[in-house]
């Protein structure tokens, strides 16, 4: 794993968060380098700047290294991005008092003079971000977006024109391009939340824009809902909750249980919280945590059931280390006799990991693509 970042005379040591030993993963990519080179070559001075979708702080660390007084407004939906940026600022002895942090639902400041962005994987979320920017950016404000060259096409440039202003792409460098968009100063209305029903479970679901499977029940969740365990559970964790559908169904099946919803995405946690209220479930039984797995779950919470539909990517990176951390956290936090109940793609071979961690693993159900596994502490 490469940790030495060297671009445009800026030297940093950067790590992913949480730590990963996978040799092909690092805390930045060529699009970060391209953005920084574009800034430095353009002679950009320190003006109020928004940095959006900065995975682990490469952009904020680089600008802070250039000028410790550079006023930076850092926005991300991912808790691990905040924690990674904080870790990398401390590691490189960079100030934090020039940073103001925002989630993807917070109101952005109105004095921005420059925006740096990374193109997210979810283009519905990206369009939402552009609409939010349109509400605060003055006409003529420059927005620079770094992305893989293969992700940039006429349709993407049209997304800019529709939601923020005209845009053009640079020449390719290390298989990346920088898109320059000039705000037209016209505020756009934000889109309404996506809502849909699961009639067989009498659930009404709403999703914010960065939530997985935004307008339907994904296949993994479907097979999980049909195969939840029986038992008199008192404390349940929906780990990587997304819109909260597993925890919502658990609340119906185990009405005496406290349900804890945890996700790295702030929009996911907000969606789960809204869905809990919209389905008229008891307020005192639902608990919501924007967290890196169960890292900051209160000490007194000792679950007897953890439900998990683990992701196998972090941003653009395909990786199983998030699932591994989820399984480790479940083993650490479950009470003795407690159950980890997961769904995963067959080819990911999660049964090997669970057998290694728990010394037991049972196949509960399966189909051609997915498998439900259960391990007991």
UniProtKB/Swiss-Prot annotation:
Catalysed reactions, semicolon-separated: guanosine(1835) in 23S rRNA + S-adenosyl-L-methionine = N(2)-methylguanosine(1835) in 23S rRNA + S-adenosyl-L-homocysteine + H(+)
Subcellular location: Cytoplasm
SUPFAM superfamilies per the UniProt record, alphabetical: S-adenosyl-L-methionine-dependent methyltransferases (SSF53335)
Pfam families assigned to the protein according to its UniProt record, in alphabetical order: MTS
E.C. designation(s): 2.1.1.174
Keywords: Cytoplasm, Methyltransferase, rRNA processing, S-adenosyl-L-methionine, Transferase
Keyword rRNA-binding: no
One MF annotation (Gene Ontology) recorded for this entry: nucleic acid binding
GO CC entries: cytoplasm
Record's function text: Specifically methylates the guanine in position 1835 (m2G1835) of 23S rRNA.
Family to which the UniProt record says this protein belongs: Belongs to the methyltransferase superfamily. RlmG family.
Family matches, as HAMAP family: 23SrRNA_methyltr_G (MF_01859)
Name used for this protein in its record: Ribosomal RNA large subunit methyltransferase G
Lineage: Bacteria, Pseudomonadati, Pseudomonadota, Gammaproteobacteria, Alteromonadales
């Amino acid at each position: 794993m490469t940790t030495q970042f060297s671009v445009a005379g800026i030297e940093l040591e950067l790590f992913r968060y949480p730590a990963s030993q996978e040799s092909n993963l690092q805390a930045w990519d060529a699009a970060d380098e391209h953005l920084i080179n574009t800034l430095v070559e353009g002679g950009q001075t320190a003006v109020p700047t928004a940095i959006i979708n900065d995975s682990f702080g490469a952009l904020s660390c680089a600008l802070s290294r250039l000028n410790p007084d550079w006023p930076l407004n850092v926005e991300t939906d991912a808790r691990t991005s905040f924690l990674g940026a904080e870790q990398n600022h401390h590691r490189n002895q960079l100030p934090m008092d020039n940073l103001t942090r925002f989630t993807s639902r917070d109101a952005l400041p109105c004095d921005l003079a420059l925006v740096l962005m990374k193109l997210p994987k979810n283009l519905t979320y990206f369009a939402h971000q552009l609409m939010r920017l349109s509400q605060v950016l003055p006409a003529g404000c420059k927005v620079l977006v770094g992305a893989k060259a293969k992700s940039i096409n006429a349709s993407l440039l049209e997304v800019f024109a529709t939601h923020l202003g005209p845009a053009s792409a640079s020449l390719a460098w290390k298989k990346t391009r920088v898109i320059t968009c000039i705000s037209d100063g016209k505020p756009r209305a934000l889109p309404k939340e996506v809502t849909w029903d699961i009639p067989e479970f009498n659930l009404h679901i709403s999703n914010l824009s960065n939530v997985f499977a935004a307008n339907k029940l994904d296949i993994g969740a479907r097979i999980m809902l049909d195969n939840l365990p029986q038992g008199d559970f008192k404390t349940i964790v929906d780990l990587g909750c997304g819109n909260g559908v597993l925890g919502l169904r658990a609340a119906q099946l185990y009405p005496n249980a406290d349900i804890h919803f945890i996700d790295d995405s702030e929009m996911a946690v907000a969606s789960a919280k809204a869905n809990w209220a919209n389905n008229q479930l008891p307020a005192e039984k639902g608990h919501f945590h924007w967290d890196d797995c169960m890292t900051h779950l209160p000490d007194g919470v000792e679950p007897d059931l953890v439900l998990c539909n683990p992701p196998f990517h972090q941003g653009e990176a395909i990786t199983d280390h998030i699932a591994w951390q989820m399984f480790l956290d479940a083993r650490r936090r479950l009470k003795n006799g407690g159950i980890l109940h997961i769904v995963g793609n067959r080819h990911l071979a999660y049964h090997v990991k669970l057998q290694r961690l728990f010394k037991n693993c049972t196949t509960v159900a399966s189909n051609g693509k997915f498998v439900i596994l259960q391990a007991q502490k």
